[in-house]
Regions:
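Core register positions within helices of long alpha-helical scaffolds
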Residues: 51, 117, 177-180, 184, ...
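Short, surface-exposed recognition loops or helix-turn segments adjacent to catalytic cores
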Residues: 133-138, 142, 153-169, 213-219
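C-terminal ends of transmembrane alpha-helices
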Residues: 24, 150-157, 204-208
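Structural helix-adjacent loops and short alpha-helical linkers that scaffold large soluble proteins
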Residues: 1-8, 55-72, 121-142, 182-201, ...
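Aromatic-rich carbohydrate-recognition surfaces in CAZymes
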Residues: 37-151, 171
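Extended ligand-binding clefts on enzyme/binding-domain cores
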Residues: 5, 42, 77-105, 167-175, ...
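Low-complexity, Ser/Thr/Pro/Gly-enriched N-terminal "stalk/linker" regions
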Residues: 1-43, 70, 74, 78-89
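Alpha-helical packing segments of well-folded alpha/beta enzyme cores
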Residues: 10, 17, 44, 71, ...
């Protein structure tokens, strides 16, 4: 099976999830109803759109541009919904209505991931589609940065939607979003965030215990989880931002990876296979070998 065939299948599956809802711009996490993943998560949608943006960069195909525009219009719509936790609301129904059932909210990685993505979109569209950028991209970014800065010191739920407190993953993507805002501040953005960013980087060091990265603290400051797949995802999703690597060298991520591999080899008798899940003793659907 060649790589081009695999890539085509992956893209096809992405497009199925993008085109599932009648409301353009909605991206389902999965067509599954059990577990119930047929929702538009702010986090998941932003990560899916990273792939679409990359495809547009490579191909300049109109369909990918249309996916991007649909996504932008939908996110602008979602930002204005009357939801329980505002921009920290983790997901919405695929018909565009708020999801108001009990859930782990707020989840403050979502707006940051969306913001990181939108700066990528900003950079690739600003010359060819300046009106689109000014009318859609910039206002979404501004609302997200205002929310993130206002809530930096407040606890939230982690990306696994289980722990309420402070989380390595959430804080890293927030830091990356703020850094991107600062990098673009000489153009259209003017909020002064340099000192906020520098202080936030200092606070990130709370997640270091020697060479070990602490994934989550509860609201009392107690360590809740250490070896967690979200630590590895954090490095990927901030695109190995150098300011972050200066604090958390990749050798520290390697320690987390090695511990996870060891734990899952023991759990599933994997011998030499390097397959991991979210974290050791994960009980959700028996804690299988997966993470976002």
């Amino acid at each position: 099976m060649n790589n081009s065939f695999i890539n085509e299948k992956i893209i096809s599956k992405l497009e199925e999830n993008i085109n599932f809802s009648k409301k353009k711009g909605m991206i389902i996490a999965s067509p599954s109803s059990s577990p119930p993943y047929k929702f538009h998560w702010i986090r998941d949608a932003a990560l899916v759109m990273r792939a679409i943006v990359d495809l547009y960069k490579k191909t300049k195909e109109d369909k990918y541009l249309m996916y991007i525009i649909n996504y932008l219009e939908n996110e602008a719509y979602i930002q204005n919904l009357d939801t329980i936790s505002g921009l920290g609301e983790p997901k919405v129904n695929i018909d565009g209505t708020p999801f108001n059932d009990s859930w782990g909210r707020p989840q403050n990685d979502g707006p940051a991931l969306r913001g990181i993505l939108l700066f990528d979109i900003y950079d690739i569209l600003k010359n060819d589609y300046p009106n689109l950028v000014d009318s859609l991209v910039v206002p979404i970014i501004q609302k997200d940065i205002d929310y993130i800065v206002a809530n930096l010191k407040k606890p939230s739920f982690d990306l696994w939607e289980e722990i309420y407190g402070w989380h390595f993953y959430t804080r890293l993507v927030q830091a990356k979003f703020i850094k991107e805002y600062i990098n673009h501040s000489s153009s259209i953005f003017n909020k002064k965030l340099d000192n906020i960013y520098k202080n936030f980087l200092v606070n990130l060091k709370d997640h270091l215990n020697g060479n070990t990265i602490i994934s989550s603290f509860d609201t009392d400051g107690n360590i809740v989880r250490i070896d967690d797949g979200s630590v590895l995802l954090a490095f990927c999703h901030v695109k190995y931002e150098q300011d972050i690597l200066d604090i958390f060298p990749l050798e520290f991520a390697k320690i987390t990876a090695e511990n996870l591999i060891s734990d899952f080899r023991k759990k599933y008798n994997l011998h030499n296979l390097n397959l991991i899940g979210r974290y050791n003793n994960d009980a959700y659907f028996d804690g299988q070998l997966w993470f976002i």
